[in-house]
Amino acid sequence: MNWDDLRVVAAINRCGSFNRAAKMLNVEETTIARRLARLEGSLGCVLFQAVDGQRRPTEQCRALLQPLVLMEQAAEAITLQLERQERPLRNFRLTTIDAIAQHYLAPTLADLLIAEPELSLQLETSDDNVDMARWHADIAIRLGRPRRGNFTMRRVGEMRFNLVLPRGAAPEDLVLAAYPDPLMEVPEMQDFQQYFPGRQARLRSANLRVIRVLVDSGRAAAVLPDFLSVDLVGDERFQVHRLPARREIWLLAQPHLRDDPLARRVTNWCADLFAETLAGDAV
């Protein structure tokens, strides 16, 4: 008795015919009949009878089916384990800004890694745009369209911004929070400076969550992206003003990954995270 013969029994039981069982196992119908006859000969009993054009298991066959199912499940588990052991991990380096990593990527990272057991992801955050030409990253998510470069790129989303300040506070009494000096030329900071011309920020940070905590104190004014401020819309403690500034979200990948199935699944996962940002305004 061998495992291939037992698999034939399981297939015939599932499919109800030699022909469909052969297609399921990707063998010839004559092979199915031969293996079944060999097994019936070794057991000394008939395992299937033809009833109304279907192959129905006999009583002796039904006695075999439950342990046979357990054997199939064990074989599948062993095969899966061996495949995982034999499949080498592939490391991709993904870079983006801290806020995107925390808000968009982190909540579903576990789902991605479980779905892709061969994937090892090195996630790095930086306020500076990485140099893809120097292979500082395999995949990058950045704000603003790259001017040039030897990489694939696609626009996957859009980031909108709100000015948030405590309701009823005098402008001169507000603590202003803004980005560090090197980032003051970005569109949202230009809008911010139009609201408070000539005023100097008392806090400068690229960490948007730190700025959000300061805003929550009720003593500060700052610019925050939608995903960190939309919950304040309708909060009587705050005024939330939509700013004209928009920042496009771009997904970049090294050119050699264009036709790589795993890389494509990772980049599609990234793109899907931002789909709602293109659907409409939150405020």
UniProtKB/Swiss-Prot annotation:
The keyword Transcription regulation applies. Residues 1-58 form the HTH lysR-type domain. This is Mau operon transcriptional activator. It holds the Pfam family HTH_1. The lineage of its organism: Bacteria, Pseudomonadati, Pseudomonadota, Alphaproteobacteria, Rhodobacterales. Transmembrane segments: none annotated. One of its GO terms (molecular function) is DNA-binding transcription factor activity. The keyword DNA-binding applies. InterPro entries: LTTR (IPR050176), LysR_subst-bd (IPR005119), Tscrpt_reg_HTH_LysR (IPR000847), WH-like_DNA-bd_sf (IPR036388), WH_DNA-bd_sf (IPR036390). It comes from the Bacteria. It comes from Paracoccus denitrificans. Transcriptional activator of the mau genes involved in methylamine metabolism. Residues 18-37 bind DNA. Keywords: Activator, DNA-binding, Transcription, Transcription regulation. Belongs to the LysR transcriptional regulatory family.
